[in-house]
Curated annotation (Swiss-Prot):
Function of the protein: Supplies heptaprenyl diphosphate, the precursor for the side chain of the isoprenoid quinone menaquinone-7 (MQ-7).
CC cofactor: Mg(2+)
Free-text remark on how the cofactor is bound: Binds 2 Mg(2+) ions per subunit.
Listed InterPro entries: GerC3_HepT, Isoprenoid_synthase_dom_sf, Polyprenyl_synt, Polyprenyl_synt_CS
Protein family membership: Belongs to the FPP/GGPP synthase family.
Name used for this protein in its record: Heptaprenyl diphosphate synthase component 2
Organism phylogeny: Bacteria, Bacillati, Bacillota, Bacilli, Bacillales
Keywords associated with the record: Isoprene biosynthesis, Magnesium, Metal-binding, Sporulation, Transferase
Species for this entry: Bacillus subtilis (strain 168)
Length: 348
């Protein structure tokens, strides 16, 4: 199945703006410029997020603000706002959807860091590292509860149903990841299902619910859902590639951290096709150190695993563009296209 997907990916045209060596900083600026006209509304979202994570309990507030202030691209809120422009855009309504989805994402990060025993997130200590696992778990739970309370301000039964189904799927994705740690026998289907549940669905629903909350036609919000889904799949695959090709400074965590924590990603699945590498990869376990992993990472980079994974990411990105082209032309569509292009080129 890996070969079939790779052949399909390589048969699609490559996305290019004529400058494949775009500087990381310039690329990041292009990403932010794609939605700069929404900066005032993004500020509204930031204030709402800060207010939502605050609690009467100082420790909860401190932990929540610690994660919030670590930064992040806020891709999900941006997708909510841009998708809302396909209907009757009202920031005072749509902000609740944007905050809800970012809070769910943040809660999943806190829980992820406990599961993976991660010390760093975006270059700063994780909540579990700064406090402990119990504080981290309850902070994540508090954020999830806060997100659900926020969503009650939207009187859209369909949106509530979609959101509840998505949360169930996200939880299943987390459970699958725990179950498959250090399992080098898993297949591509398992990996794709896991990244769909852990990443792609939340981005897909960000696009869909933004449109639903603004009263957009069903045809539009369904197309936006699939655009978000394909972008989300591409985004996670790029994330998994960067775990090998980026630097600790850019990642904000050790290179190869996913593999060290036992998470088998697409580059690893391709690398497993190399018999010698497969034997080395199967020896990785919870006792493996960063120093022991470094030569294996270098060997993976020497194979075609990174290139093959990039081809699959680009295949999903092309599918996203195909869905986007069915939507009405305008500023929102142009911005979504620019963001999707950025995702295919991002370096961190």
């Amino acid at each position: 199945m890996l070969n079939i997907i790779r052949l399909l990916a390589e048969s699609l045209p490559r996305i290019s703006d004529g400058n494949e060596n775009t500087d990381v900083w310039v690329n990041d600026m292009k990403f932010k410029m794609a939605y700069s006209f929404l900066n005032d509304d993004i500020d509204v979202i930031e204030r709402e997020l800060e207010q939502t994570v605050r609690s009467d309990y100082p420790l909860l507030s401190e932990a929540g603000l610690h994660l919030l202030q670590a930064g992040g691209k806020r891709i999900r809120p941006v997708f909510v706002l841009l998708s809302g422009m396909f209907g009757d855009y009202d920031i005072n309504k749509i902000k609740y959807v944007a905050v809800t989805l970012e809070m769910i994402h943040m809660a999943s990060l806190v829980h992820d860091d406990v599961i993976d025993d991660a010390e760093l997130r975006r270059g700063k200590p994780t909540i579990k590292a700064k406090w402990d696992n119990r504080i981290a778990m309850y902070t994540g739970d508090y954020m999830l509860a806060g997100s659900l309370e926020m969503m009650t301000r939207i009187n859209e039964p369909k949106a509530h149903r979609i959101l509840s189904q998505t949360i169930v799927e996200v939880c299943l994705g987390e459970i699958e990841q725990i179950k498959d740690k250090y399992n080098m026998e898993q297949n591509l289907r398992t990996y794709l299902r896991r990244i769909k549940r852990k990443t792609a669905l939340l981005i897909a629903v960000s696009c869909q619910l933004g449109a639903i909350a603004s009263g957009a036609d069903e045809k539009i919000h369904k197309a936006l859902y699939w655009f978000g889904y394909y972008v989300g799949m591409s985004y996670q695959i790029i994330d998994d590639i960067l775990d090998f090709t980026s630097t600790e400074e850019e990642l904000g965590k050790p290179v190869g951290g996913d593999l060290l924590q036992g998470n088998v990603t697409l580059p690893v699945l391709y690398a497993l096709k190399n018999p010698a590498l497969k034997n080395q990869l199967k020896l990785i376990n919870s006792e493996t150190t960063q120093e022991q992993l470094e030569p294996i990472i270098e060997e993976i980079k020497k194979t075609d695993a990174i290139e093959a994974s990039m081809a699959v990411s680009e295949m999903y990105l092309q599918k996203a563009f195909q869905k986007l082209n069915t939507l009405p032309r305008g500023r929102a569509r142009s911005s979504l296209a620019a963001i999707a292009k950025y995702i295919g080129k991002r370096k961190f």
